[in-house]
Every structure is written in C-alpha cells, then in structure tokens.
A protein has these predicted regions:
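Amphipathic alpha-helical dimerization/coiled-coil segments
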Residues: 2-28, 48-49, 97-116
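Alpha-helical residues within the helix-turn-helix
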Residues: 60, 77-78
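N-terminal helix-turn-helix DNA-binding core of bacterial DNA-binding proteins
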Residues: 26-67, 87-99
C-alpha cells in the first residue's frame, strides 16, 4: 500500500503512539540518503567553507571528473541540501542551511520520541 502525501505514520512505543507526517519523513530520508556518502560530505564541507562554488571550482578542488562532481551535486540539489544561483554564465552552488536545519530538527524530534 502506497502512502499519500497528506497521511501520517504512527509508530508504537509501548503504550505511546508517535505520529509523524509521512511527507516530511520522506523528505528527511531523501536528505539523509544524499548526505550519507563520503564524496558528497566533502562537497558539503567545501561549500560551507567557501559559501558558494561552481562545479568547476569543486571538481578541481576535489580532483574529480566534471561529470562525477555534477552527478553528486545533482543528488544533493534534488534532496534540497544545496541550492543554485545563476550569475551570468556561471551557476553557483551553496548549502541550503535552512533546509538542513529543518531536517535536523525533524530527526531530533524523531529520536527524542523513540527514545534512541
């Protein structure tokens, strides 16, 4: 059975039920999967250190093929971890801190409610 976007997930913990928004949970899982990769973690660190960078800046700094850097940036972008900004012919990538903070709060809430 496939969950609808407006449904909730109920976790049982003893006599206590924990209700979670299914759509928010899916978004959190997407972000966690995206950042659970060494290279993508390095990309995030570089972007945090430099505020914003082009794909060229990133692949030179990380000594990667351009296509590899682009693929990993696309995964991070789809997950909402990084955002893009066009300046002339250049596209700059930056960490979307608001999105990261939102997911972080959701994960904290989940771990508090499940007692882990």
């Amino acid at each position: 059975m496939r969950k609808q976007k407006n449904e909730t997930v109920v976790l049982k913990k003893g006599k206590k039920d924990i209700e979670l928004d299914y759509a928010e949970l899916r978004k959190a899982v997407l972000v966690l999967r995206a950042v659970n990769h060494k290279l993508r973690q390095q990309i995030i660190e570089l972007l945090e250190e430099n505020e914003k960078m082009t794909v060229t800046d990133l692949y030179i700094k990380l000594r990667l093929e351009q296509s590899v850097a682009s693929q990993h940036l696309a995964i991070l972008r789809r997950a909402g971890v990084v955002a893009t900004e066009r300046q002339g012919k250049f596209i700059y990538y930056r960490v979307d801190k608001e999105r990261i903070n939102h997911i972080s709060r959701l994960v904290e809430e989940l771990t508090e409610n499940t007692g882990n």
